Amino acid sequence: ISMDKHATKAALKDTDVHLIPDRLIAHGEFPASKWYPCVLKDPLGGSSIGVWICHTPQDLKTAYTQSDTKEFLLERYILGEEITVAVFSNQTYPVVSIRPKEGFFDLEAKYTKGKTEYFVPSPLSPQICSNAQEQALEAYQKLSMSGIARADFIVTEQGEVFFLEINASPGMTATSLSPMAAQAVGISFPELVEQILHTAKCTRSQHEESYKPPNGFWLLT
């Protein structure tokens, strides 16, 4: 379910996860928005590919005509700081603040060295961080997820925490966000990989009953 942003939000509708208003648009149905700015995106997309921030109806028309996805997800645009929370085996890890030097956290900002600054633990207030961690854990549990997942959020200037998506297969390079968060609680990249491999070959019950990480932390991504 988590691979589909619209299906994920539908599954989380009756939870305490703070969702951004949206609507699903079929290909061939010209979109009209009651929110400006708004965001047009591929509900099955990743790495911010095919994400358009539209400030006017003309922007929305341009985004629509230049996209070739089967469906579109139209959302109200939320201005704020992006953060991410890793969850592993029902445990949340420190919040990471993501601050692109220009624009938003798009494909270039994600994968070009020096384009984005990361802060872990996040300098945001403990209340905001706790809120994000609680929402991430609730989404993880509601979707019956296991192993590693990473939930992304937007935090407004007023301190509201809005859920963006939860990634069941987050990046796992030495410079990815999950290892970055793990390092903040003393888990090295090799240790993180070892824990992932261990849990991958265990059933949930075996994993929870027979294995405890030596430093007391389950990894996060």
Name each model feature, range by range.
Residues H55-E134, V155-F162:
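Phosphate-binding site of ATP-dependent enzymes
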Residues I1-G80, T221:
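Active-site nucleotide/adenylate-binding loops and adjacent lid/helix of ATP-dependent enzymes
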Residues K5-K9, L60, F104, T175-S178, ...:
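A general structural signal for well-ordered alpha-helical segments in protein cores
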Residues W35-P37, E82-T84, R150, F163:
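Broad gene-expression machinery/nucleic-acid interaction feature
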Residues S48, E117-F119, T173-S178:
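Short small-residue beta-strand/loop micro-motif enriched in glycine and branched aliphatics
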Residues T15, Q66-D68, Y111-G114, A139, ...:
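Alpha-helix boundary/capping residues
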Residues P126-T221:
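ATP-dependent carboxylate activation and anion-phosphoryl transfer catalytic cores
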